């Protein structure tokens, strides 16, 4: 193999992500697919549901932490995905869409959780010697409190049609915020300045 050919192989390899990162690529696609699925339930929002709209206090203070979590962003992805799936698996619900559509949403979330878990496990294998940071623990706890407020709202409203309409909109909003944070982190991590700081 000539030196020139070796140089080309090295250059191509530099821009091809490792195989394990494919789980994370698929995860980004799944999040966007679920944003669309959840958005499809927003058509025809009943006026009678407006009185039940609640501020679930999404913890915006965690966003600066997330935007700097190069090594832990996938653990946060798994946390959000699994908590969202737990909400949509609650029993005794009155879904705001047809049962078939509801199953599509749950199936989409299950796929997102599975991919988030695989992505997270890939990351853990690579960083076994690095314990989770205090920032990660803060994000982990705040997300737990946020989804608990959503669950409590559903319970108090007896899983009503309006409650589910509102919760679906909220979780979609959460996914959009998080998806933007992932994209921003990716842009930052791929910048020459960031790479230089890691050296």
UniProtKB/Swiss-Prot annotation:
One of its GO terms (biological process) is defense response to virus. Keywords: Antiviral defense, Cytokine, Disulfide bond, Secreted, Signal. GO terms for cellular component: extracellular space. Induction: Upon exposure to double-stranded RNA and interferon-gamma. It comes from the Eukaryota. Residues 1-21 form the signal peptide. Expressed at low levels in peritoneal macrophages. Pfam families: Interferon. GO terms for molecular function: cytokine activity; cytokine receptor binding. It is found in: Secreted. The keyword Secreted applies. Its main location: secreted. Disulfide bonds join 24-119, 49-162. Belongs to the alpha/beta interferon family. Transgenic mice overexpressing IFNK in the pancreas, develop insulin-dependent (type I) diabete. May play a role in the regulation of immune cell function. PANTHER family: INTERFERON KAPPA, TYPE I INTERFERON. This is Interferon kappa.
